[in-house]
Amino acid sequence: RFFAFQYGWSTFTIIQTAAISALAYVFAESLQSIVHLPEVLGSLSDYNIGNVFYPFKNFNVKLAAIILILLLSWINSKGLKLGAWLGTAILLLVFAGLFTIIGFGLTSHEANLHMAFSMQTTNSQPITISGMFTAMLAAFWAYQGWASVGYIGGEAKNANRNIPVGIAIGVFIVIALYLLVNTAYLSLLPISSLELINQPGNGIAAIEAVKIFWGRSGELFIAILILITTLGCNHVTIITSCRVYYAMAKEGLFFKSARQLNKHAVPENSIWIQCIWACVLVLSGTFDQLTDMIIFAIFFYY
């Protein structure tokens, strides 16, 4: 019970709310790359708290992220049926986009599958287990969604069977897509190019890979795909995470108001409490700061 209490509050303060904030931030940055967002409160951009947090820096992006969180929270407060319809539509669009990248990436004339499976490195240092683990650290966040399935166990039909099956199928799909997409990237971009892209401010590997066979239009395609993907992931994170605080509140471990259901049988107060804190986290830092907090907290409990 003690560790469950600790995990529940960590889920609220960092793990899930920071994930919501980070995903909304990526959505807003992708939107900024498509439609230039007007500057907001630019005169306050240098205001800081302890020379660490700059709440008004890139405030136009942060404001767009906050609006997205508010909108998705409102949609999810109107019932699971509306939320499920939106989630299904987004999922189909994401699959279509990913399979487009995989198909064109692996079959284009510029693709070199041998390069994708090469063990060549850009330095003389040997490949070690610790090095592989460090490289995979951020990638582990892609698999974190498996834990969220259990959050809605109380509302699932035949949960004892369907929850484990859903987790197994979901993780398998993520593994397959992750390997296929990265094979496409590696067949188009040599390791040296990926190393340069990984340096701060140099771009995104997906965009550079797609530009090889689609040119500048590929950049727009990836930006739109990132918009759709982060929208869908954020939607699911909001709809599942609030169930944790609802369950905690029923046991007296969270704010009492979070245990109340609205007329749609949804823990609306839990959703809005989560929404408020996620918006605060958006103002607190950048995408890198948010994801660093998430990964640290997640691995502590693993």
Feature map (PLM): residue ranges:
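Hydrophobic, membrane-embedded alpha-helices of multi-pass small-molecule transporters
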Residues: 64-71, 104-105, 122-176, 181, ...
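TM-loop-TM module centered on a large, flexible mid-protein loop between adjacent transmembrane helices
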Residues: 1, 33-42, 120-121, 127, ...
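Helix-loop interface residues and adjacent transmembrane-helix termini in multi-pass membrane transporters
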Residues: 77, 156-160, 284
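Membrane-interface helix termini and inter-helical loops of multi-pass transporters
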Residues: 42-53, 110-122, 194-198
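Hydrophobic alpha-helical segments and their helix-loop junctions in multi-pass secondary transporters
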Residues: 28-36, 92-120, 140, 182-191, ...
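Membrane-interface loop-to-helix entry segments
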Residues: 60-111, 144, 167-171, 291-302
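Hydrophobic transmembrane alpha-helices that form the core helical bundles
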Residues: 1-69, 74, 226-247, 283-302
